[in-house]
Every structure is written in C-alpha cells, then in structure tokens.
Amino acid sequence: MHMKIKKFKKIKKKSKILVKAKLIAQQVENNREEYSALSIEDLRIRTDYLVDGLAKDKFTLEDIIVDALSIAREIIYREHGMLAYEVQMMGAYVVHTGDFAEMYTGEGKSLTLLLVSFVNALTKRGVHIVTVNEYLVERDALFAQKAFEKLGITVGYNTSKLSKATKKEMFARDITYTTNSELGFDYLKDNMVRDINEKVIRELFFVIVDEADSVLIDEARTPLIISGQPKEDFSLYLDIDKFVGSLAEDDYKIDNESNTIALTDQGVSKAEKFFNLTNLYSVESAEIVHKITNSLVAHYIFANGKEYLVKDDKIYLVDQFTGRVLEGRSYNAGLQQAIQAKERVTIEPENVVMATITYQSFFRLYEKLSGVSGTAMTEAEEFLKIYNMVVVRIPTNKPVARIDKQDYIFGTKRVKWNHVIQEIVNRHETGQPILVGTASVTDSEIIHERLTELKIPHEVLNARDNTKEAEIVKHAGEKGAITISTNMAGRGTDIKVSDEIRELGGLYVIGTERHESRRIDNQLRGRTGRQGDPGESRFFTSLEDALFKRFATDRFEKASQKLEEEFYDSRFFSKMLDRTQKKVEGLNFDIRKNLMDYDHVLSLQRELIYKQRDQILLKTNNLNIINNMIDDYVETEILNFKNNDNTSLVDANKIVAFLNEKILKFSYFTPATFANMPILLAIDKAISIIKKVVDVKCKILEKINGLNVIDEILLVNLDQKWTTHIDKMTKLREGVNLRSLEQRSPLNIYIEDGNNLFERMKINVVTDTITSICNLSLPNEMIEITNALDEFVNSEEFKKKNYGNQREIEQNFNSALSFSGSATSEFDNFIESELENTLIEETPEEYVEVEEYIPQQTEPEVVETETTPYGFEIPKYDTSGTDKYELNNGSSEVNILENESDIFENSFSQIQNTFNTEELDPQETPHTAKADDQFVFESANLEDDIEEIENVSNIDKAPEIQQPLSEEEIQKILDMPAFKDDEKPLTIGNYLDNILDSMDIDYDQDKEITQQLEPSSNEQEVTANIPEQNQLDITTSDIDNEIELLDESERESIKEEIQKSISFDLSNDPDFIEYRNSVFVNKNNGIDYSDYKKLNEDESDDDIKAFYKLPKVDKKEPGTLFGGNLLKKTPFNFKNKNELDNEKIKSTNLFREENQASEQELNTLLQLDDEKDRLEKINQLLNKEDPEVLERKELERQVEFETPVYYLEDIPEGESLDNFKAMDNPHEEQSFEDNLVDEENQQLEFEEALDEVIDDGQFNDEVEAAELSEEVLEEVINPNPEELSEEDKWLITKKEHEKFMEKYLGDVKELTSENPEVVTALLQEKNKNLKDVEIIENNEELENTNEEEPNINSQDSFLNNIKIIKTVDKESEDETEIIQEINQPAEIHNLQKDILDYLKENNKK
C-alpha cells in the first residue's frame, strides 16, 4: 500500500502576516478619536454587546477584532495611562491568530498579552495566560483586573498557595494568570478527583504562553509527575553509593555530548565482585544496575550548586534555564535517592508515578495555543513542527541602539575570571551599571567572593536566595550598581536607566559563559538597550567551559594552541562558538522530538482514561458501563472453558464452577444446564445471567442508598490499574532501546508493546470491577438473586435463546479470531490513523509504504478446520509462534520474559537525557478533566519566504491510500510554488523527505562576521558588526515597503482576508444600535442578569446532564473504554455560584436603593406589635442611602431616559416583561413635576409635625429612639398609616438616627474601652485570612480575602462592612476612633450585640 501524498495549498508569506497585522493596527489607531470620546458606560455596553453577539453566533472574533482591540486599548489607557503602541497591537493580532510573536525585550509583551486576552475573553470560555513565576502572575493579574473588570471581564490568578475552592473560582473567571507548572499539575490533579465538583479547570480553550521558548522548548524535556504510594525499600542506596564512590576514572565512561555515563568492562567486573554477582546484567540484577546508573549520574554528572542545592537536610532542584529553585519538585526513578545518598542527607522512599504529562502534550490539548518571547526565531522550525505555530518577528517601536561586542575567548577559567573581575572594576570606576550573568550558582559565588575581597559593593541574585529578586533587578540600572545573576530568562522586571546612565553608555551586560542555546544568550543581552536606550554586551568564555568540553572536543586542541594567557575575539572562535551552539540546539531538538513521539502514545491512552473517568464521575450512565464490562469479562473468561473433546462446546463443569464460585458465591447452577452447549451460546447465556445478578445487587444498593459504592468500585479499579500501567510504560520506555538487536525501530516496538499493555490493562479493569461487584455482601441478596434467577431461567425469553442466531455468532467469532492479536480495540481505532502518519519511521524507499495496522503482525497460519454441530467450519490456527521477549544477557542461557512488565526497568542510555521531575502530592488524595487532544502534527516546514502549510484539521481519519502517482502528477507537484528551482526533488522519496523532515529552512538570520580581528590587549576594545540575530532590524517602515512591493493581486488578496475585520463598524451597526436602545442602562449598572444560569448546591443528575449538555447515548462510544456519554463540553462553562450570588445581591440592592422601601415592607413595620421586632425592621431600613441622594438620582434618571425603569425583581413569578409593562404603574398617574411639588409640601408638613412631637417630649429616654409606637405614627405622622409616603418614613428614620446614636454610641465605647481586644477578635473571627486585621470599605477589597460577599441585611453584617481604612491596632484609643467612624444605628446595635455575645462566650463580665 502507498501513502497518498498530501498536496499542501499555497498560503501567504510570513511577511504577509505582518502586513495584515499592521493593517489591523492602523484601523485601531483610526478608531482612537471615536473611542476616546466614549464613557465607561458606553464601553461597557459595547463590551456586553460583543459578548452577546459572540454567544449567539452573530459574528466571529475575526469580525470584531478591531473594535475589541480599540475597547481594550482605551480602557487600559484610562486606568493605567499606558497607550498601546502600533507594534504592540500588531503583536496582539499575531498572538490572536494562534502564532508566535517574537517581540524584542522591553517592547511591552505584558501589555500585548492584555490586549489579546481581552479580545478572546469576550467568548466567556476562559483565557489562560502562562508566565514563568508566581510574582509575575499576581502582579500582572492585578494590573489587568483594574482595567477589565469595569467592563464585565473578570480576571483571576492561580498560584500554589490557593485552596482548591479558590482555584476553581479563579479558573471560572474570563482571564486567569498562572504558571506553567501549576497549571499542568492542576490538570493532572483534576484527573484524579473522586467528585466532579472538585475539578478546578474548565475547558482548555485558549492559552498564551509568555516566554514561550523557555516553557515549550527548554522545559519540554521535563515531564510533570505526581507521585504517591511510596516504595519502602531503599536500603541498597548507601551500599551502591559506597561502591560508585570507590570507582576510578577507568571504571566508567562519560559521553559529554549526550551527557550520559556507563560502566566500562573494568567497572562491570568490580561491580560483580562488590555485589557478589555472576552476571551484572542478568534479569535478577536489574534493580542493582538501575541504582548504579543513577548513582553514577549523581556523582559524576550532577553537581551541588548547578543541578541541585543542599539546604536544611534536603535536596532542592535548580532550573537550568532560569537559575531558580524548583519548589516541590524532585527527580524520579530513584535519581533523587541517589543524590540524597551522595550528599548524606535523609533518604526518602522512592515514589510510584500516579499521573504524568509533558508540556508538549498538555499545551496541545488547548483549542488555540500561542506564545510570545524575545528570542524564538532560532527555534522557528521546532515551533512549527511540534506546536503548529509560525514564528513572526514583530518590529521594534524604536531602533535598537545596543552594541553587542565580539566574545573574549580565554584558554582557562582562571584567566577568564581574572579578566572578568578586571572588566568589572574598570567599568565600575566610571559609574556605569553592570549586570553579570552566570551559568550556575557556583559561578555567581566565585565572582561574589572576588568582589567581596576587593570591597566592591554588589548584589547577588541566584537560586540560594531569590527572595528579593524584583527589588534587586529594579535597581540594577542605577549608577554604580553591580548585579550578579544566574540566567536572566523570564525575570520579568524591566531594568530602567536614567538620562545620566544613558550618557554613560547604558547598562553593561557581561556574560561569563555561552549557554547551550543562543536564545538564552540573547535573553541576557536583551536586558540592556530596551526601547532605544543605549547599551552594551560582551561574553567572556574559556575553552574549559561546559559548552566546549561537551560539544567542541574535536576543535579543542587546535583552539588551545592559539591561546595562552591572552584572549582573542577573532572570527575563528566566534564561528566555532556558533557552530557548537547550533550543534547543541539540534541535539536537544532531536531529544525533544523523540520524547514527543514516545509521549504521544501514552497521551492517547491518557485521553481515553480521562474521558472514561469523566463518564463515571457524571454518574449518569454507570450501569451501562458495567453492562459493557460484563460483555468483555464473560467473553474473556468463558473462551478459556472449551471442552477438551470438542472445542466448539463449552466445558459444563468449568462454567458452572465459574458462575457458582466467582459470581453467585453459592451453588445454583448444575452442569446439566450447560451440557453439550456451544461455547458462543454459553457466552450469551452467561452474560444474561451475570447482568441479572448485578441488576439485583444494584436494586438492593438503591434501597439502602448505596449506589455510590458502584461508582467508587469503578473509579478505584480504573485508577489503580492506570497507575500500574504508567509504571509499566515507563519501564518499557527505558528498556526499549535494549531491543534494537531485533532490527526493528525502538519506537515501533514501543507502540506495539504499549498497545498490548493497554489492552491487558483494560481486561484487568473489567475483571477486577465485575469481581468486586459480585463480591459485595448485601442483606438478603441470596434470596433475591435466587428468586430473580428462577424467574429468569424459567422464562420463555431464556428458553427461546436457541441456536437461531448461531450462524451470525460463529461468523463474527471467526472474524474476530482472524486478527490474532491485531489492533482492534477502541483504543486502536482511535490512534491508528495518527500513528501511521506521525510515529512510524519512514522507509528509505522511493515509495513510502504504510502498514494497514499497527503493530505489524503476521496473520497466523490456518493448520486445520473444525466443523460445528450446526455445520459451520471454524479455522484452527498455529499459535506456536506467539511473541515472547528474548534478552541475551551475555551468558549461554537465554532468559525468556513472558510479559512486558518483566522487561528491564533500567535504562543505560536514556535516563540521563530526560531527568524527569515530580511533584509529591502530600495529601495523596486521588484527584479529572476533559483531555481533548488537539494534537496537530504538521508534516511539513514553512519556507521562510515561500509558503506556509495548511492546518491538518482532521487527525482522526486514516490516510487515504492510492496507487503510485503518474509522471504528470509528479511534475505538477514539482512545479508547485513551494519549491525553488534548485530545490526540486528528483524522486518521490526525496520529496517526502523534504516535506516530512526538513526543507533546510534557515531560520537563523546570522550574518557572517568577515572582519579580520587581531588579538587585542586589555586597553584595546574591538567592536564588530552586530549579528543580525541579536537585533531586530525590521521596522514598521519596512512593512510599508513590503506592501508597495506586492503586486496588485497579492495586495487585494491580503485586504480581502481582513476586509470584514476592518469594515465592521460597531457604532453604525443596526443590531448594536437596537441593543443599546433596548438594554437597561444605569450609571451604576448596565447588566441584564436574566440570561445568567447557575446550578443549585444540591444538583440532581438532570441538572448535571444539562450543565454538561451531554447527548443521550446508551451504547459504547468510540472515544471511551467502556462506553458512556461522550463529553461534548467541559464543566464550568458558566459563572461560579459565588459570583452569581454577588451579582444578584448587587442587583437587589440597586432596586432597593432606587425604590426605597416597598409598600409591603412599610405595612409589615406598622403591623408589628413586638417592639424588638419593629426595631430590627427599622434598623434594616436604615441601611439605605440618604433620601436626598436617592431623590437626586431619581431625577437624573427620569430626565435622562424619560421612561420608567423596570427591574427584574419587580416582575411577578411567571409574568412576562411585556405583560408587566402593560400593568398600571402608580408612578405614572401624575407628571414628574407635579409629584415633586406634592412631595415637597408633604416633607415640610411632616418635618413640622415631627419637631412638635420631639419638643413636647413624647420620646422617653428609657425607650430607644428607634422604637416608634404604632400610636405615635398614627397620631402624629398620618391618620392612615397605609398611606405613609416613603419620604415621610425616611424623615422618621433620619430623626431617629440622631437620638439613637447618643445612647448606643456611649454604651459601645464603654464596652470596647474595658475590653480592647474585642473588636480585633471579632473581625479576625469574621475574616480568618487576615493576620492583623485589614478593614474593608464598602466590600471593594472583599474579593482578595476569598470570602463571600455578605448580605447587607443580615444582622451580623456589620463586621464585614466597617468603613475604616486602616489596620486595627491593639491600643484602645485607636478602637475608640473606629467606633466614632461608625454612624449607622443598625451597625451600632449589631456591634453591641456581637460584643456582648463575645464576652459571654469568653466568660468575661
């Protein structure tokens, strides 16, 4: 069979993406005047309209991109005074399209992310912004929150300190800032939960990765691992550490290029002697070999201060790319224990992997992935192949003025350090600030010690102490500052310089060693010369640096001869460094690509497991899942019960023993029931019997409310078997390279064996689940099962299950037998089409052949046939050739490994390349989320100036197979514009090599330095041309020139693509105008809450199904293991309950404030006989605004809108809004002006009457002023209490207030002065998240305390609404000041009550 060659359509050049971005940015700039004239309310209305239109599919994000960017730009400018540059809007557009924007350091990437996150947040599906540390997460989230929440776009952040409930609330917001590791671990924990409501992440819609090259490239080799269930045995570690420590250099060999280590023959002999072994590499010694390998790495490859730190009797990992300590991480597979033994710290038990995922697999789960960084062009090919992102370089806002000088090369580190210190001293004397970048903590401490000896002040920022990171970096640009730092990638704080420093030449950056990647060097250089500032950089390297030792050994001797005590900065050494770095980058890419290929197999299995867990957690279809499992279980078991004399019949004794002993646990069936029964019919009957038994058990459980036991059994068995499967897959991965002697690709072997392991895991899950259910001991189960079986076995349905369908059964069975181990499971169907195209290595033939199934297996030979009693022939196969794994251990004996779990669990060549780290779950609580794999594997590259490939939109379909191409078709392919004349392939094989491997695209823009440089002395400085890779020479004017160079058709093509985005005019859109006129608008609120949905706390199954919007499916689905409804949407698409409740409270308060008290409230007040109840009701009414303020608001509202305002709370239950509007409105009986005159007269009359009552002394001081009797109201205020106006009532409360305060205020002051700790204690009790006591004003800061917003009408609400803006002190006078600020009678009353209750509880007088 031959693979059909995909003809990729021609698409635009990379520069055309920039052209489109600039046209969009220009249109946003054109809208500046219009949007700057809008009020906040107008911006909010436009935002709400865009949200509503997207939800109803009126338009797409592409249509409204210009207006959305205009809104975001304007609100950010108003709140922060920062107006986005044109280049930032261009970057936002590139990121929005799902590509990679390379923005030079200091060009405002954070603001760019704000713009694009707002645009995509309009979908209300959640935007995740990933940054490199938690400090930046909180800083940027608060920055965004201030601007966007005024427009109804919520912003949250996710850090390791947050509780699970808070994380869930944060992820429910429209924009969530998080770190990459925390996001990945939350995803894994979500897929280990036992309750679906414990999941914190909603759908994986759109993620923007800041410093994406660091996250997606540098950290791609480090899987995220959650471990648990520790293994107890670690006694061998100290013995092995002692042995490894005694080895000589001849006993082991280090491959510097791959950074691996292994014992030599001499070392193997020593090991066998030390451990008293006959053969070190026998299967029995596998564990010892594994631990020796780890110990070799710990002793001779890893070093304290570089890969890890020893602190407080613990091992802390160090991020090799940023120099930060990786909190909560540890090496897995025993390497952590080997390091602990080496450093003589406490050895912790080795852990079992419970969940794992790589960043490559995780981020491809998102529907849309994009990234930004200052250095990505060198890895453009990898971003395209792995993540399907085109790297687009964004022009700088101002020309780059930094000077990158030629490297200084030294022969030894000793000479290098001397020159580095001398350079620092010389520059420090001029006052120029200096930033020194080192590759390790050890190097930074060497410079620190030397400068300390010279008494030169400086700051050190490394993994040992990074608590003051932001502060240190902030002052690094001041005069005379010297900052020594490990890798500066992702530090996130701009180093700003003053005019004085600019005169001195700006910040001077010294690199003390070239890194493995040119990107890391460029990131260090990029710390100076931001936004057109002057700056300078130079690297000091020696031939003893790690980069030379590992990767330039062939040139080391030649280079050493050129250097003695002097240094050179010649073209020879510069080119050697560049070639060496390119070599390392290529090697690392191969490692990451290899890791991705292997991880893709596991990720497909992971997706099926996680989807199945979701089905179980939903609890809507678990009985159907059980029934599917029974089908698989019975068939697997009973196929082993063939009659020895006639294999087409079942062995009656075996099947009876199976049913009575394993299923029923009591004797019921006899061999006569299954005598002379064909095995396939026996399977059918046994399935019916077991389903009936399980059905009876479920009915019993339902009676005792125990159906959740079934759910728990399903989850426990699935989780346990999945954990075991991960462990087996890890061992298979580590040992698969040892089987290369089979003359097969290790990857193909891994695919085949991994698939077999997964099939075995499924069988084990089914077996253990059904067995566990049948083993449940329930009340009266024997009687009920017996009665049910009697009825079922004697039924006509059971008796009529004759052999009428035997032909169909046997034909299906024959067909099933024919594959003999071929991939036919749901899992295989799910992954085969992808594996064929993406994972199977290409053959070197001219035509690429793809086997129809994976793994490739030979169909067994038919040796004979048998005839059934019903005349059908069943073939018998020769199964003697069943695969077993053979391992030649070097002895004459060949060990047979019966299953994959016995394969070597050690790796002699791979463990050092992928030093996995893991996060230990301290609670060991099993934690699931939708695992939609949006894996898009692009099998072609993008020619830099030629074309991009078409996205692969359907990865589930198998490739089409067709006959070899004709010469004419081949010629058409060769004539495609994707190839230049000199790149035309000669054969189809070459063509596929170019498409599937590489077009030799040179994304590296390095210019060769042709200037010959002579050796220079300390006094002489040599300046070379700046390499193009270190500067952004593209400007916006270049893009204009590019547009001019385009022909008319190309120009029109670009404009046509974005015409809809540019021409969309929101202001003149008829739908928007209608929306604006119809929507309820108020200066304080512009939201209609009628469309919001929420789930009640006690959700029913129907609620959950509606929430997930699941289809009704009763049969197996191809996306799961055992069936169930396939998830179509991820949970938590709606706002969380707290947010909805808060919005409801705000809406209710608005109604109460605008309408004051309702007639019903007033009548209730007047009819209360009990004085205490009446006082409480009045206190509630007093929690309202001044009536004069309300009157003014009402006047403004009426004048502005000239129509009555209807509130949701006004509408009776079941009544429509239109009908409600048609009702009589009492406020419309008179004109507004007439009402004002009448109300004014009533107020004057009322005030006079009330003053007379007070002056006559009708109020008794002994009686609290608020307790107005019904008689007083009737006699003084109005002869008819029911006609009392709202204004009169408010005047009553105003007068009450003055009298009320005099008595209560004194009582409370006295209580608090005698017990000064009371207020503080009460406040801390109400808000446990505050250490001292942070006073909250008007609930504006309440969200930061993670507390629900209180109901303002609740009696204890006062303590959450104190109107003081300072921290509570323990001093009594400060507390007195607090009380004086409280000016509401209801608050005083509640405070006094709370204080008295507190004193009573604490037995104080």
From Swiss-Prot:
UniProt-recorded Gene Ontology molecular function terms:
ATP binding; protein-exporting ATPase activity
Q: What is its EC number?
A: 7.4.2.8
Specify the superkingdom. Answer: Bacteria
According to the UniProt record, where is the region Unknown?
1100-1405
* GO BP term (any one): protein transport by the Sec complex
* Cytoplasm keyword on record: yes
Under InterPro entries, the record lists: Helicase_ATP-bd, Helicase_C-like, P-loop_NTPase, SecA, SecA_DEAD, SecA_motor_DEAD, SecA_preprotein_X-link_dom, SecA_SF2_C
Catalyzed reactions per annotation: ATP + H2O + cellular proteinSide 1 = ADP + phosphate + cellular proteinSide 2
Q: Where is this region: Protein translocase subunit SecA?
A: 1-1099
Q: What is its main location?
A: membrane
Q: Read off the Gene3D superfamilies from this record.
A: Helical scaffold and wing domains of SecA, P-loop containing nucleotide triphosphate hydrolases, SecA, preprotein cross-linking domain
Residue runs in coiled coils: none
**Keywords on record:** ATP-binding, Cell membrane, Cytoplasm, Membrane, Nucleotide-binding, Protein transport, Translocase, Translocation, Transport
* Gene Ontology cellular component annotations, sorted alphabetically: cell envelope Sec protein transport complex; cytosol; plasma membrane
NCBIfam families found in the cross-reference section: secA
Return the similarity comment. Answer: Belongs to the SecA family.
Function noted in UniProt? Part of the Sec protein translocase complex. Interacts with the SecYEG preprotein conducting channel. Has a central role in coupling the hydrolysis of ATP to the transfer of proteins into and across the cell membrane, serving as an ATP-driven molecular motor driving the stepwise translocation of polypeptide chains across the membrane.
- What is the annotated quaternary arrangement, including any partners? Monomer and homodimer. Part of the essential Sec protein translocation apparatus which comprises SecA, SecYEG and auxiliary proteins SecDF. Other proteins may also be involved.
Give the matching HAMAP family.
Answer: SecA
Q: What is this protein called?
A: Protein translocase subunit SecA
Tell me the organism.
Malacoplasma penetrans (strain HF-2)
Q: What is the lineage of its organism?
A: Bacteria, Bacillati, Mycoplasmatota, Mycoplasmoidales, Mycoplasmoidaceae
